[in-house]
Amino acid sequence: MNSSPARAVRALVQSQSRQRPTLERACLSCATVVHARRCFSVLDRPPPNYPGHVPLTRVERAGLAVGSGLWSLLDPRRGDLIAAFAEATATPYFVPRLRDAMLASPTGRRILRDRPRITSSSLDLPRLRSLPQGTVGATYVAWLDREGVTPDTRAHVRYVDDEECAYVLQRYRESHDFYHALTALPVVREGEVALKAFEFANTLLPMTGLATFAAFTLREGERRRFVDTYLPWAVKNGLRAKEIINVYWEEEMETDVVDLRKALGIEPPPDMRDARKRERDARRRRKQLETEAQQGLDAASL
């Protein structure tokens, strides 16, 4: 009779011993999840998830979004503020949506796997200058030369926590000049606003939507032209075009730019440089006529 309780005790001890590794693993897993989700302070930041990453508290992220957003509206030339606003507002919804769009595309998945970077050295700009006129590469490098810009000026993503999402935003940022070349929109405030409206309709990134409000800072003629011509073009083409984040630009350099536009479903907008030139010429003629009229009045009064 006494041996039965002893056997029961030994069985219980053995059962607990067998379960201990499983319990320890479960506790460790719970601790890891809690640590990953716990709040932290500016004095106790978690380690960065990738080189250059700066983890932010919710308060810091909100402050960065509000501050950079307001100041970038006041001074649209501050690219650093625009970049900070983009990163502060890109998560948790908008960049993950772009990543999911890339994962749904065979080309997008290859981009995420290869993680190419767009720089002067990676693109081999001298080779692009030798490509036939009308190709994507030749159009892109001609646009760079005409506007006096390089692909090496894009800031590195710092405030997006997920490493893959950070790359998606970096890829979007480095592809921006290709969007300019594809649409032939110049690097002037009016051109940037029109392109940002197109990007917002296509990507839904909040930064691109905020940048569209810079239209209120345009001159009257530019603002009227944006509302009448380029905003309708941007909304129509941005919504109907394929996800431009999925273009593997490095593989399209020898593609005819007209064919790529058709493949993406993008119509080129009216030539903004020509429209701005016509406006300047008309303004110059009006000023000349006013001067001549004033000179005529002065001569008649003598």
UniProtKB/Swiss-Prot annotation:
* This protein's name: Ubiquinone biosynthesis protein COQ4, mitochondrial
Quote the function comment for this protein.
Lyase that catalyzes the C1-decarboxylation of 4-hydroxy-3-methoxy-5-(all-trans-polyprenyl)benzoic acid into 2-methoxy-6-(all-trans-polyprenyl)phenol during ubiquinone biosynthesis.
Q: Where in the cell is it found?
A: Mitochondrion inner membrane
Provide the family line. Belongs to the COQ4 family.
Broad class of the protein's primary localization: mitochondrion
The annotated topology with respect to the bilayer is: Peripheral membrane protein
Species of origin reads Pyricularia oryzae (strain 70-15 / ATCC MYA-4617 / FGSC 8958)
Q: Where does Zn(2+) bind?
A: 176-177, 180, 192
Which pathway, per its entry?
Answer: Cofactor biosynthesis; ubiquinone biosynthesis
The domain of life for this entry's organism is: Eukaryota
Task: Keyword check for Nuclease, yes or no.
Answer: no
The EC number(s) given in the record are: 4.1.1.130
Where is this chain compositionally biased, Basic and acidic residues type?
A: 268-282
